[in-house]
Swiss-Prot record:
GO BP, one annotated term: alkane catabolic process
Gene3D superfamilies recorded: 2.20.28.10
UniProt keyword Secreted present: no
PANTHER family according to UniProt: RUBREDOXIN, RUBREDOXIN-1-RELATED
Rubredoxin-like domain location: 4-55
Binding site for Fe cation: 9, 12, 42, 45
Organism name: Rhodococcus erythropolis (Arthrobacter picolinophilus)
UniProt key word Manganese: no
Record's function text: Involved in the hydrocarbon hydroxylating system, which transfers electrons from NADH to rubredoxin reductase and then through rubredoxin to alkane 1 monooxygenase.
Family: Belongs to the rubredoxin family.
GO molecular function annotation: electron transfer activity; iron ion binding
Protein known as: Rubredoxin 4
Cofactor note: Binds 1 Fe(3+) ions per subunit.
Names of required cofactors: Fe(3+)
Length: 60
């Protein structure tokens, strides 16, 4: 089990999974939320990084 977290956009529901990253924006798998630039925005709706919230997930 790992300690990667999942963050969800409050505007559109887009999910950022630290384990997966977002290679389309140059964010490699394993990139922690805190290491993503503050000016990064939701790829689906353009919402600010501050509009995301952490989601509790159980990984197996």
């Amino acid at each position: 089990m790992n300690d990667y977290k999942l963050y969800q956009c409050a505007q559109c529901g887009f999910e950022y999974d630290e384990a997966v990253g977002w290679p389309e924006d140059g964010i490699e798998p394993g990139t922690r939320w805190d290491d993503i630039p503050e000016d990064w925005s939701c790829p689906d709706c353009g919402a600010a990084k501050s509009d995301f919230f952490m989601v509790e997930v159980e990984r197996r």
